[in-house]
Amino acid sequence: MQSARMKLGFVAVLALAVSAPAAAAPGDHIRLGDAVVTPAVMTGIEAHSNLYLADGGPQTPEVTAMAWVLKPHLGLELDGRQVKFELGAGYGLKKFIDFYPEDEFFPENADRFSDFDVDLSLAVLPQSRVGFRLEDHLDNEAYAAELPTLEGSTSANVTHTGNDLLAGVQLRPGSALQFEVLGQLGIDLYYVPDSLLTLPGTTAYNGRQQYGPVVTGTWKFLPKTSLVGNFSYNFLRWDNNLIEAIGPDIEGSSIGSYIGKPDADAWRVNAGVTGQFTQKLAASAQIGFGAMTYDEQSVLDDPGVATIVSAVDELNVTGAETFATDTSITDGILVNLQVAYAPVRGHSMTVGYRRDFQDAVFTNYVAFNNVFLRYEGSIQNRLGLGAELSYRIDAFHGEVVRSDQNLTAKISSSYKITQWASAGASGSWLRRACAAADCDEIFYSTQYDDFSGTLGFTFAY
C-alpha cells in the first residue's frame, strides 16, 4: 500500500514536470504547471524531564534526556477544476545523547529512526453532481516504554503502525445539498520490546483491522452555515484475542498473565449544525449516540486458550467488568462542541468539548470526556504564537478497569527570519494521574509528569 502511494505521487510529479517547466525562488516553492511542490526540513534539539514516562518511584525513577531532531517533509498540491490532489510525506529522526555514560541508564535505547507519516487527499469532479473522494493517512510512530536500564543496543520503544483509508462517492443533487457514501478501512499494528513479552518470538504484540460503511449528509441552508449528519458502522477484528498482560506486576489487581481482547462491532449516528455565524464567531455542535458490542466467543475460540493452561484458568465471562463488557448507555452518548472567536485579525481563541468512546488495545474500550482551550496568533505575519490547555478523563472498561486524568499544557512560538527560514520554540507539560480512589494502590505506575521543550529551525524552499 505504501509503495502504491509512492508510485502515485511520483507519476503525478513526473506528468506535471513533463507538461510545464519548474519555476521557483527560495520561499516561493517549486511550481510545476498547476502544481506546487513544497520541500522543507526542520532540525533542532528536544529535551524531556521524564523520557520513559515513569512514575518517579524508587524502582522507576525519572530520567532526563536530550535529543537531536531532524524532520524533512515534502508537500505536493494540485488545485484544478476537475481534480484536487494533495500529498504530504514526512520523516522523523530522533537521536538521544547520553551525557552520563557511566550511569545505569541508556537513553539511546529510545532513539527513533523509523517515524514517518503520509497524507493523501484526492477529489475528482468536486463541483459535479457525482464526484469521487479519497483520503488516506499512513504513519509509523514510536515512543519510549518504561525501560530506562535496557541496553542501548535493544530498542525500548513501543511502536504503532497504522493506515486509515476513506473513499467513496459524493452526490450533489442541488447546490445546497450533498451526500457521501463512503467505505472505511483501517489497519493497526502494535509492536513492543521483546523484553516485555514472556512468550518467545516476535515483538508484534497485536494487530487490528477495522472496516465498514460511512454515510454523511450536508445541507447548506445559509451561505456559511450547514446542517450535518453522519452514520457509520465499523467491524473491528484483532489478530490475537488472547494477549499478554504486559507491564509491571500490580499488587492487589485481579489481572493475571493474560487478557481477553475480543472482536467488536461498533456504530455511531450524530447530527448537528456547523458554520460561520458572524464575522468573528464560528461554531459547531453535534450530538449523537453509538454502541460497541463485543464478541466474547472470539476470545474463547483463540488458539491460545487451549494451549496455555494458565490462560484457561484466568478466563471469566461473568461479572460487571470482564472481556464480555459492552458499552453502556451513558458511554454511548456522543457530544462534539467547538466555538471559535477571532476578536481581531490574526488572533483566534477556540474552546471545545468532546465526549466519545473507542476501542482499546489492552482492554475492551475507553470512554472519554475532553475539554480544551486553544489560542493561535500572528503578529505582522512574522511572529507566530500558540497556546493550548486540555483536560481529558479516560474511563477504561473490560478486564482492565481504571480511570485516568490527562492534563496537557502547550506553548509555542515561531519567527519568520526570511521567506524560506524560520526559528521556533515550544514547551509542554504532560501529566497523567489516576482518577479512582484505589489508583494509588493498584495503578500507581501509570502516573507520570513530563516537561519537554523544543528549539529548532525550519527551512522551506
Regions found by a protein language model. Give the residues of each.
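Bacterial N-terminal signal peptides
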Residues: G9-S19
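Exposed boundary/loop context
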Residues: Q2, A17, P26-G27
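Bacterial N-terminal signal peptides that target proteins for export
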Residues: M1-F10
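Gram-negative and organellar
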Residues: A24-Y461
